[in-house]
């Protein structure tokens, strides 16, 4: 009997079909963020990173051209079991020599090479307007700016991204999740909290007034509790984005598990959201004391988030994307490690006897529930993971 066969039998004794778990996982798309490979710099300007976010470290090998970034992504993908989508920011537009378009004038043609890359690897594409790292971010504000010229520029950028998102979906044959996030906010206590949010609301409504096929483009709005330089007030708060998505047909909320107070757990928010939203999006990261965007590892909260998605039969309702960036280590390794960590978490959730555990809770057998939860932790998940890697032609960590 092989190691996998022995492990499979142990899981089967608890009613878990590991073969089925592996096949399900292979088909679950997870969006792979290109910005880990170049420290969120992009190709459309030479300025520094803004928007209340930052990368730390100076490890050699940062991708500096589209060709280098694509090559690094291909290298990382060789190490990944399962299905990946490509996640792009608008700042990764690729221009021909002598060509340039500002963000309010971006067109599908500026992303043609990314479409070719995605088709080569049978990937869908998700997209993000880039509301940071640009000279027209005025006083730290974009879509909520009181300066109408500034606000109009960024509204037009959002509309351009709607058109580009639809182009991606039509070309790849897969829906494009388009995420709206800004770092708009104030460093110190504001005199007016409502005004910026009313402008922000109007701006997003104008962006979403751009015609698009709702089956192809999946807009979402992302919240954040604070950022560097915007510690006192963030325009796009959790209450704002949840309310906006609830009241605007076709718009989803997006939760980033690094964008909340450290004692808030997105794993607890996921089932609450599933009670009310037919679908929503998730950015998966690892915050260390704040939204530090450390590389994802198989820690407790990562496992709990995966459990809540799987045990509530929501793999087809939650759009999952990675979002972290670490410049202190090998970037290809960082991208692959985070992807594999999320795959491990999903596999563990798929190999958990969820119905049995739920029955124990519903019948108030809490002592047995604790015992079984602890027993599940000791099951030979490593053998199931090794089988997934082998059947996906992906390297084992030991290699």
What is the meaning of each model-derived region?
Residues 107-132, 136-248, 252:
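Active-site acidic/histidine proton-transfer and metal-coordination neighborhood
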Residues 262-288, 322-324:
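A short alpha/beta connector and helix-capping loop motif
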Residues 29-40, 77-93, 98, 104-135:
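Glycine-rich, aromatic-flanked loop segments that form ligand/cofactor-binding clefts
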Residues 24-36, 51-90:
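Catalytic domains of carbohydrate-active enzymes, especially glycoside hydrolases
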């Amino acid at each position: 009997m092989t190691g996998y066969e022995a492990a499979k039998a142990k899981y089967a004794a608890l009613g878990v079909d590991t073969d089925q778990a592996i096949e399900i996982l292979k088909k679950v798309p997870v969006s792979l963020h290109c910005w880990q490979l170049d420290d969120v710099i992009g190709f459309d300007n030479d300025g520094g990173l803004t928007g209340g976010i930052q990368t730390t470290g100076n490890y050699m090998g940062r991708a500096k051209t589209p060709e280098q970034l694509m090559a690094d992504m291909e290298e990382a993908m060789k190490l990944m079991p399962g299905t990946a989508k490509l996640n792009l920011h608008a700042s990764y537009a690729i221009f021909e020599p002598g060509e340039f378009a500002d963000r309010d004038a971006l067109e599908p043609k500026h992303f043609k090479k990314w479409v070719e890359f995605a088709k080569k690897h049978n990937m869908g594409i998700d997209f993000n307007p880039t509301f940071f790292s640009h000279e027209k971010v005025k006083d730290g504000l974009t879509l909520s700016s009181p300066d109408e010229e500034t606000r109009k520029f960024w509204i037009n950028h959002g509309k351009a991204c709607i058109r580009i998102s639809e182009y991606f979906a039509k070309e790849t044959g897969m829906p494009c999740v388009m995420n709206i996030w800004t770092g708009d906010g104030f460093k110190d206590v504001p005199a007016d909290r409502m005004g910026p949010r009313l402008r922000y609301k109007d701006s997003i409504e104008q962006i979403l007034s751009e015609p698009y096929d709702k089956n192809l483009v999946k807009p979402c709005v992302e919240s954040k509790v604070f950022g560097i330089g915007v510690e006192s007030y963030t325009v796009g708060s959790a209450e704002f984005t949840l309310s906006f998505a609830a009241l605007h047909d076709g718009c989803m909320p997006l939760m980033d598990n690094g964008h909340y107070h450290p004692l808030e757990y997105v794993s607890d928010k996921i089932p609450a959201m599933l009670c009310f939203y037919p679908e929503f999006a998730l950015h998966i990261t690892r915050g260390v004391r704040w939204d530090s965007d450390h590389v994802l590892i198989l820690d407790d909260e990562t496992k709990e988030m995966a459990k809540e998605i799987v045990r509530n039969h929501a793999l087809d309702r939650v759009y999952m994307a990675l979002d972290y960036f670490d410049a202190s280590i090998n970037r290809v390794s960082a991208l692959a490690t985070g992807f594999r960590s999320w795959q491990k978490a999903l596999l563990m959730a798929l190999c958990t006897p969820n119905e049995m555990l739920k029955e124990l809770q519903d019948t108030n057998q809490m002592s047995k529930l604790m015992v079984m939860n602890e027993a599940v932790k000791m099951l030979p998940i490593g053998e199931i993971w090794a089988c997934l890697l082998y059947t996906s032609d992906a390297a084992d960590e030991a290699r």
